[in-house]
């Protein structure tokens, strides 16, 4: 398998039998929007693909549950910070479940605070950090390769930290490792009361979870390349003299009316609202027709088209299941590897080519129904189910005992040429969306 690596700007071979994946999670101060969802769905597909290819996958996902945004939201809602993070963490988990996302290992920042503090102390003791007005800053001038990921010249860069910048820093690119504060939840450290910087939280979790061993893929949105991922990498260079991961995979922007979707622009769509009005499979399908690295313009037409596509897929699967039963076959309980689909996704997650394979299989199933060649094409059904498993959108099995009995009655009536009664049952099956 090959994946495009942001750092080397080349396709990197993913040959290891055990793969470590880390994807930056949300700051749990609000519900996630559809732009937040794209990396989650993309890496869920990658995980499923690797696991279906007999790879062991260690997938870690963080939750940032301390941040100025959380403090501000708590004040707005007249809640404690813990109440805010609990509310939106629970909402996030509900969305992952409703969208059929295989749950990664979740690491909350507050659960690993003692380790983060020790991590900062190590950086400081190696003289890659300095104190300024009570805050601890990472000294980016000590890293010769600073900018290696984002390919930016130092004078083009900005700190991009989530707190107000100090003009007296050694370099404008220096970022906070430890922020002195009297507001909100805080921890004691040798640097005084405060809390860690955002960039350090993720860098520590990756270091702690994977121990600088194995093949590591780091994923996230393209907007995180700089400064977040650049600064994660800088800390690893300081402590271990090596880049943080083996492959950086960044997912393209989601656009609304050709503008980046973001809460700051107030042009976002909450995922929870989409789920209320659309099949979760359609929401996932939106991401399966465009290269994951490219921008995706989201509007009403794209979700409507996805809904229609998914309805066609579900209809074909259910109809084929019905004709399997009518032909006295069992519905296969196992799938078959679809090599063409796998080949497409192994080529840097080529969603366009992979999705074309699905439509080719749909065509085979529809033709097998039309020309009464069900038995000869069971393989196509099994391959289609395998593809849909990777995409996380396998149609539910709605052929219960009652429906199976009706299908058998319908088939028997047709064989006996009792067409009037057969049509009556056929209409019932159509209403149940299995014919």
UniProtKB/Swiss-Prot annotation:
Catalytic reaction(s) noted: tRNA(Cys) + L-cysteine + ATP = L-cysteinyl-tRNA(Cys) + AMP + diphosphate
Q: What is the free-text note on the cofactor?
A: Binds 1 zinc ion per subunit.
What keywords sit in the KW lines?
Aminoacyl-tRNA synthetase, ATP-binding, Cytoplasm, Ligase, Metal-binding, Nucleotide-binding, Protein biosynthesis, Zinc
User: What GO biological process terms does the UniProt entry carry, in alphabetical order?
Assistant: cysteinyl-tRNA aminoacylation
**Which InterPro entries does the protein's record reference?**
Cys-tRNA-ligase, Cys-tRNA/MSH_ligase, Rossmann-like_a/b/a_fold, tRNA-synt_1_cat_dom, tRNAsynth_Ia_anticodon-bd
Q: What is its EC number?
A: 6.1.1.16
Q: Subcellular location, in the record's words?
A: Cytoplasm
Q: Position of motif 'KMSKS' region? A: 260-264
Where is Zn(2+) annotated to bind?
24, 202, 228, 232
Q: Name one Pfam family in it.
A: tRNA-synt_1e
Q: What is this protein called?
A: Cysteine--tRNA ligase
Q: What would be the name of the gene that encodes this protein?
A: cysS
């Amino acid at each position: 398998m090959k994946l495009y690596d942001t750092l080397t700007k080349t396709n990197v071979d993913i040959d290891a039998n055990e793969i470590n994946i880390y994807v930056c999670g949300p700051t749990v101060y609000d519900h996630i929007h559809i732009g937040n969802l794209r990396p989650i769905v993309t890496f869920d597909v990658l995980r499923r693909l690797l696991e279906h290819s007999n790879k062991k996958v260690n997938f870690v996902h963080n939750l940032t549950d301390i941040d100025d945004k959380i403090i501000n939201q708590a004040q707005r809602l007249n809640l404690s910070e813990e109440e805010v993070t609990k509310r939106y963490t629970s909402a996030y988990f509900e969305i992952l479940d409703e969208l059929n996302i295989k749950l990664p290992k979740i690491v909350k920042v507050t659960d690993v605070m003692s380790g983060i503090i020790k991590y900062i102390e190590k950086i400081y003791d190696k003289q890659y950090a300095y104190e300024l007005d009570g805050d601890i800053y990472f000294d980016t001038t000590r890293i010769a390769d600073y900018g290696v990921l984002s390919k930016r010249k130092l004078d083009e860069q900005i700190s991009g930290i989530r707190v107000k910048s100090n003009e007296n820093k050694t370099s404008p690119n220096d970022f906070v490792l430890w922020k002195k504060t009297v507001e909100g939840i805080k921890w004691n450290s040798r640097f005084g009361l405060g809390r860690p910087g955002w960039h350090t939280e993720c860098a520590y979790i990756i270091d702690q979870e994977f121990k600088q061993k194995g093949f590591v893929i780091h994923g996230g949105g393209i907007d995180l390349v700089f400064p977040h991922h650049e600064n994660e990498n800088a800390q690893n260079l300081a402590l271990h003299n090596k880049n943080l991961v083996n492959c950086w995979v960044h997912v393209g922007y989601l656009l609304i009316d050709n503008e980046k979707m973001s809460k700051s622009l107030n042009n976002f769509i909450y995922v929870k609202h989409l789920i209320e009005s659309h099949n979760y499979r359609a929401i996932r399908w939106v991401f399966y027709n465009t290269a994951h690295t490219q921008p995706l313009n989201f509007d009403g037409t794209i979700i409507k088209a996805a809904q229609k596509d998914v309805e066609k897929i579900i209809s074909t699967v259910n109809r084929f299941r019905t004709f399997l039963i009518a032909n006295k076959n069992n519905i296969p309980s196992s799938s078959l590897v679809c090599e063409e689909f796998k080949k497409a996704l192994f080529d840097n997650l080529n969603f366009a080519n992979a999705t074309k394979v699905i439509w080719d299989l749909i065509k085979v199933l529809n033709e097998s129904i039309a020309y009464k060649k069900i038995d000869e094409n069971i393989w196509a059904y099994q391959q289609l189910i395998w593809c849909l498993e990777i995409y996380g959108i396998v149609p539910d099995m709605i052929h219960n005992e009652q429906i199976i009995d009706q299908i058998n009655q319908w088939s028997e009536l047709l064989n006996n040429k009792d067409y009037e009664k057969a049509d009556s049952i056929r209409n019932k099956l159509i209403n149940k969306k299995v014919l």
